[in-house]
From Swiss-Prot:
CDD domains: GT5_Glycogen_synthase_DULL1-like
Protein name (database record): Glycogen synthase
Record's keyword annotation contains Glycosyltransferase: yes
EC number(s) on file: 2.4.1.21
Gene Ontology CC annotations of this record: cytosol
Pathway involvement of the protein, from the record: Glycan biosynthesis; glycogen biosynthesis
List of residues binding ADP-alpha-D-glucose: K18
Taxonomic path: Bacteria, Pseudomonadati, Pseudomonadota, Alphaproteobacteria, Hyphomicrobiales
Keywords associated with the record: Glycogen biosynthesis, Glycosyltransferase, Transferase
Catalytic reactions on record: [(1->4)-alpha-D-glucosyl](n) + ADP-alpha-D-glucose = [(1->4)-alpha-D-glucosyl](n+1) + ADP + H(+)
Gene name of the encoded protein: glgA
Length: 489
């Protein structure tokens, strides 16, 4: 097995900084690749949380000027992660999230903040750190999308590139007037380069200029080649279909393990499912729900947004209430949705509980205590919460889209008869169909044998990174072999 060295480029990484699933992927993939002969380091921005969380740091390069100020590249570690951290206080030392300020508005200099990340990645790929020259650069989402552009237009030898789309809805578009300031030549602003409807498209750059494209589920790879999910980039994705692959995400099964999870009230496994009820009791107490052990407890852990379909849950509340289902919702996002869910909790105390925000400990407890977990997304590239739900014995109730349809086997008659069902799917993604799915879920819950079969199938499914990592390693090697073949032809 030929050894491969790879640089991952990501705007967030668990456990240092996380706003979504990208962080989980960036944090788990390096360790998963090691058994497949791939050594990966990850380049991340030096946000305050990152600099505070790393365990060691040694400067390996200094930039006198990087988009408005001096910067340093640090070699660092966090647990088992080998990192490069771009320390640029003028770009990253500020409050708020990685992408927006405390007021929720995008940082006005995001074009430079993430161009700096991409340019540094490209320079590492071309020998900036002599002790680490990667064979592959694997860039994630629009924040790293300029990486192949900086490589392509440098005129220098370059490593192979892979670009992964985690969510096509966020594309990183900026004024064309920034082209020269970003250090890109005039020729880069073309339909075959970074130009996208008159702007500079960071996502478009990654899709256009990388050697291979992946996205986080086979179904989403197909969906984004059509106009509904393609978000204006479907034509390009159809054009590059031969270079596009869908590889499912996994979850870190050491972090997400109900038998060892220190964040939950009681640990359990498939042979000791009765211990799970202590977690259900804790969720009910925390969300001020009535302590009725016979009621179905439905969990939601989600950003409150149109994409995530949480407005559809509000439409389906009459059915949820009539079925006697309890709801424990943890999430934040759209202020209107937040207020509507808080109002529902006030109107139906004991049956609906809502906590606005996000808390990792509570997310683990909901997975361990909810009977079912709802993911009603209008589109979902992969989704991780349903994978965690499978692992924890919370039966997933999901919209039949993207990675949700790839990872949850609907409890229809054929799947139940074959003994392979793991959850409930619904389609089309409407309030009425969600309501019907809730009624179906309640009926399944009433059949204890059927419900336990769903839990058993979910908890025995392999949702780890083992298979995805093997697919990525194969992709890297096939790409390097193709390059070698062209070089010797």
């Amino acid at each position: 097995m030929t050894a491969v060295t790879a640089l991952s480029v990501a705007s967030e990484i668990y456990p240092l900084i996380k706003t979504g699933g990208l962080a989980d992927v960036a944090g788990a993939l390096p360790a998963a690749l090691l058994p497949h002969g791939v050594t990966m380091r990850t380049l991340v921005p030096g946000y305050p949380a990152v600099l505070a969380g790393i365990e060691s740091a040694a400067p390996v390069h200094s930039f006198a000027m990087l988009f408005g100020g001096p910067a340093r590249l640090l070699a660092a570690r966090k647990g088992g992660l080998d990192l490069f951290v771009l320390e640029a206080p003028h770009l990253y030392d500020r409050p708020g999230s990685p992408y927006s300020g405390p007021d929720g508005k995008d940082w006005p200099d995001n074009a430079y903040r993430f161009a700096a990340l991409a340019r540094t990645a490209a320079e590492i790929g071309q020998g900036l750190v002599p002790s680490f020259v990667p064979d592959i650069i694997h860039a994630h989402d629009w924040q790293a999308g300029l990486t192949p552009a900086y490589l392509r237009y440098s005129g220098k030898p370059q490593p192979a590139t892979v670009f992964t789309v985690h969510n096509l809805a966020f594309q990183g578009q900026f004024p064309r007037e920034l082209l020269a300031t970003l250090g890109l030549p005039p020729g880069a602003f073309s339909v075959d380069g970074v130009e996208y409807y008159g702007s500079i498209g960071y996502m478009k750059s990654g899709l256009q200029l990388s050697d291979r494209i992946t996205t986080v589920s086979p179904a989403y790879a197909l969906e984004i080649q059509g106009p509904q999910a393609g978000m204006g980039l479907d034509g390009l994705l159809r054009q590059r279909a031969a270079q596009l692959t869908g590889i499912l995400n996994g979850i870190d099964d050491k972090v997400w393990n109900p038998a060892t999870d220190k964040r939950i009230t009681a640990t359990y496994d498939l042979d000791h499912l009765a211990a799970r009820r202590a977690n259900t009791q804790s969720v009910r107490e925390l969300f001020d729900l009535s302590l009725d052990p016979d009621r179905l407890l439905l969990g939601v852990i989600s950003r409150l947004s149109w994409q995530k379909g949480l407005d559809l849950l509000l439409e389906a509340l009459p059915v949820l209430l009539a079925e006697g289902i309890q709801l424990a919702l943890l999430g934040a996002g759209d202020p209107e949705l937040e207020e509507r869910f808080k109002s529902a909790a006030q109107a139906y105390p004991g049956q609906i509980g809502v906590m606005i925000g996000y808390d990792e400990d509570l997310a683990h407890l909901i997975q361990a205590g909810a009977d079912a977990l709802l993911v009603p997304s209008r589109f979902e590239p992969c989704g991780l919460t349903q994978l965690c739900a499978l692992r924890y014995g919370a039966v997933p109730v999901v919209a039949r889209v993207g990675g949700l349809s790839d990872t949850v086997v609907d409890a229809n008659e054929m799947a139940i008869a074959a003994g392979v069902a793991t959850g409930v799917q619904f389609s089309p993604v409407t309030g009425d169909m969600l309501a019907a799915a809730l009624s179906k879920t309640r009926a399944l819950y009433a059949d204890r044998a059927a419900w336990q079969a769903l839990q058993h199938n979910g908890m025995t499914a392999d949702v780890s990174w083992r298979n995805p990592a093997q697919h990525y390693a194969q992709l890297y090697r096939s790409l390097l072999a193709a390059r070698q073949s062209r070089a010797t032809a």
